[in-house]
Each structure stands twice: as structure tokens, then as C-alpha cells.
């Protein structure tokens, strides 16, 4: 004989569910907005209309531009975030996020105007998120662009507790007549290399594999700081010194050295038939890259196509302008070297070779 189904517990059914019960804390989101407003406020610049919190962010292109062309870029920080989780170090990845996009749009001559961020997590930790956004705001200050908006997505079940993902979006402007596209690069031009601050934000899947193999003490001293701090050093932002250089020197082309290293990024600004011949003796290989190569048994060719190997930005100028450009960049605090020359390609030759 079938037993009658039990009636729902009247106490359970009377108690309604809330968004918090589902894992989304609206109050935490509001607290984060309040916490980050002072950071965003410090990035405000001419062109910003309104503040944080609206449905859309408004920006007026500065009147100094006669024929402005908008240049946009988007990027993330990649698996460097996994190392940040492991080390519980969240104060520098925000600068990484900004750098990856503003350095990209800079190579076409664009001045970064504004930036937006996307922070996604499973459970929002206000302290961690605020630390990340503070770093984003600092990166915007270094770039001269405004942090005018963003999105914080708390999505239960999508990410493990304590983990998050980031995406950033930069928009800049350049005069139409001053777009840098590499079309004027010619044989005899010089390739200048601007020093990186470390690994930047590419190659971290290999970095993590090397760490797994070598099992180093990440807190041990490494070249004057902990190995952890050396690995997590934030991506250098080249915006202000290079915008100043463009006012005084005819910059023919630039390449942000990201995934693919020198050998895959410099060709992106070279027309067919040209090769950048780089001399590996032209700049010092930083100790961190030597450490990675040694402990990972990484071949030279693989190093050059995965890591920046100490060069975060390549700049192409005429031979006549090279010394002046080095002087201006050095005066602005950059380390810079002549790392190569442009020549005609041999038959079947790659567009960037390291000798």
C-alpha cells in the first residue's frame, strides 16, 4: 500500500530565499563600489563627464584633437593570476591589467584616454577586490587615463573561492595624420629596446611549470628581493615617456613585446620584405630569465618566442635619430639599448632573427 507523500515542512516553505542564499552578496558589491571610488577619483582627467556608478561612462574627446581616431584594446593577465592566488598577492595584478592594454594601443601612437575593468569571481571578497582595483587605478595614473567604469560579477559556482579573473579595456586617441603603422620603416633603421620590469604578463604557464619542477623557496632572496616579488613584478607602462618621445622624434614603428616574444611581435609592424636583425649581445639578459632558462632547460629559441627576455617595448627610428631618442628616453628614466637594425629579408627568412 502506497504511503501518502509527506507535506512540505511549513517552516521551510514559509522562509523565502534571498540572493545572498544563492551566493550573491549585494551588500558586498555596494561596499566594494564605495571602497574603490577614491581610487577612481584620483584618475580623473579632462574629458570625463560624470563619475562611477552610472549605466554608462561618458567621455568627451579632448578638443586638442583635430581629426581624432579612436584606438581600442582589451586584454587580461593570463595565468599570472594563478601565482597571485598561490602567493596571496593581489596588489600588482591591477597594474598588469592596465599595462597590457595601454601599451598595446600606444604602439599606434595613441594617447590612452580611459579604461574599464571586469572583475569576475565566485564569491566576492571586498578586501581582495579593492586591492586589485587600487592597482588598476594606479596603472591608470601611470598611463594618464581615467578609470571611468567597470563590472564586478559575483557568480557562485563559476570560480573556486579565493579565485577571480580579470579583463581590461582601454580606449585612446591619435591624430589621423599621426597614426604609427610601420609603413615608413626602411632598411638601415635602428631597433631600440626599452627594458622590461620583469616577466610582465606573458609566459606564466611555462613559469609555473618551471616552478613546479624546480621547487624553489619563493621567499628566498633573489637579486635584492624575494623570488616571489621578482616573478610578480608588475608590467612596466611605457605611455608617458613614449608619448613625449613622439613629440620630438619621428617614431616609425613600435612593438609591445608580449606573448610570442621579440621574434613574433616585431614582425607585426614590419612590411613584407623587411627583417629586424637583433643582436643578443646588444642588451643584458636579466638574472630572472637566466634562472628560468637554467631551471627549465629552455632552449634559446624558445626563450625568445615565449618571454620578453628583458625588452618590453621595441621602437624603430631612423639611424640619424637613434642617439637622440636614446638620450630622451634615458632622461625620462627608461633603460634603452640599440638592439638591432632593419634590413631587406633574404629569401624565405623570418621577419625577426636573433643572432
Swiss-Prot record:
InterPro entries assigned to the protein according to its UniProt record, in alphabetical order: PurM-like_C_dom, PurM-like_C_sf, PurM-like_N, PurM-like_N_sf, PurM_cligase
Question: Pathway involvement?
Answer: Purine metabolism; IMP biosynthesis via de novo pathway; 5-amino-1-(5-phospho-D-ribosyl)imidazole from N(2)-formyl-N(1)-(5-phospho-D-ribosyl)glycinamide: step 2/2
Enzyme's top EC category: ligase
Q: Which SUPFAM superfamilies match?
A: PurM C-terminal domain-like, PurM N-terminal domain-like
Instruction: Supply one GO BP term.
Output: adenine biosynthetic process
This enzyme's EC code(s): 6.3.3.1
Predominant location category: cytoplasm
Which CDD domains does this one have?
Answer: PurM (cd02196)
Q: Which molecular-function annotation in GO is an example for this chain?
A: phosphoribosylformylglycinamidine cyclo-ligase activity
* Cellular compartments annotated: Cytoplasm
| Keywords for this protein | ATP-binding, Cytoplasm, Ligase, Nucleotide-binding, Purine biosynthesis
GO cellular component terms listed in the entry, alphabetical order: cytosol
Q: Which Pfam families match?
A: AIRS, AIRS_C
Answer yes or no on keyword Phosphoprotein.
no
Q: Which reaction does it catalyse?
A: 2-formamido-N(1)-(5-O-phospho-beta-D-ribosyl)acetamidine + ATP = 5-amino-1-(5-phospho-beta-D-ribosyl)imidazole + ADP + phosphate + H(+)
UniProt-listed PANTHER family: TRIFUNCTIONAL PURINE BIOSYNTHETIC PROTEIN ADENOSINE-3, TRIFUNCTIONAL PURINE BIOSYNTHETIC PROTEIN ADENOSINE-3-RELATED
Family membership, please give it.
Belongs to the AIR synthase family.
According to UniProt, the name of this protein is: Phosphoribosylformylglycinamidine cyclo-ligase
Q: From what organism does this protein derive?
A: Paraburkholderia xenovorans (strain LB400)
Amino acid at each position: 500500500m502506497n504511503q501518502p507523500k509527506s507535506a512540505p515542512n511549513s517552516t521551510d516553505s514559509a522562509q523565502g530565499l534571498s540572493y545572498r542564499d544563492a551566493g550573491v552578496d549585494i551588500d558586498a558589491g555596494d561596499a566594494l563600489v564605495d571602497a574603490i571610488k577614491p581610487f577612481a577619483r584620483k584618475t580623473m582627467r579632462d574629458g570625463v563627464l560624470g563619475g562611477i556608478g552610472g549605466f554608462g561612462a561618458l567621455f568627451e574627446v579632448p578638443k586638442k584633437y583635430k581629426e581624432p581616431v579612436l584606438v581600442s584594446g582589451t586584454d587580461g593577465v593570463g595565468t599570472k593570476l594563478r601565482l597571485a592566488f598561490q602567493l596571496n598577492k593581489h596588489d600588482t595584478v591591477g597594474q598588469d591589467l592596465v599595462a597590457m592594454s595601454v601599451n598595446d594601443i600606444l604602439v599606434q601612437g595613441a594617447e590612452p584616454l580611459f579604461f574599464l575593468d571586469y572583475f569576475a569571481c565566485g564569491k566576492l571578497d571586498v578586501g581582495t577586490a579593492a586591492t586589485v582595483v587600487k592597482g588598476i587605478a594606479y596603472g591608470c595614473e601611470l598611463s594618464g587615463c581615467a578609470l571611468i567604469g567597470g563590472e564586478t560579477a559575483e557568480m557562485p559556482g563559476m570560480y573556486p573561492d579565493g579565485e577571480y579573473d580579470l579583463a581590461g579595456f582601454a580606449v585612446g586617441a591619435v591624430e589621423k595624420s599621426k597614426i604609427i603603422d610601420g609603413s615608413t620603416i626602411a632598411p638601415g633603421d635602428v631597433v631600440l629596446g626599452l627594458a622590461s620590469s620583469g616577466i610582465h604578463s606573458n609566459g606564466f604557464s611555462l613559469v609555473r611549470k618551471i616552478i613546479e619542477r624546480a621547487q624553489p623557496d619563493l621567499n628566498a632572496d633573489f637579486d635584492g628581493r624575494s623570488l616571489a616579488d621578482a616573478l610578480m613584478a608588475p608590467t612596466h607602462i611605457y605611455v608617458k615617456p613614449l608619448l613625449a618621445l613622439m613629440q620630438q622624434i619621428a617614431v616609425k614603428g613600435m612593438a609591445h613585446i608580449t606573448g610570442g616574444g621579440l621574434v613574433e611581435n616585431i614582425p607585426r609592424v614590419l612590411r613584407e620584405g623587411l627583417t629586424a636583425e637583433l643582436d643578443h649581445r646588444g642588451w643584458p639578459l636579466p638574472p630572472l630569465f637566466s634562472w628560468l632558462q637554467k631551471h627549465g632547460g629552455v632552449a634559446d629559441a624558445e626563450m625568445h618566442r615565449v618571454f620578453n627576455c628583458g625588452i618590453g617595448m621595441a621602437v624603430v627610428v631612423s639611424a640619424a635619430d637613434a642617439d637622440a631618442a636614446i638620450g630622451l628616453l634615458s632622461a625620462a628614466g627608461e633603460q634603452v639599448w640599440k638592439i638591432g637594425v632593419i634590413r631587406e629579408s633574404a629569401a624565405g627568412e623570418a621577419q625577426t632573427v636573433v643572432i
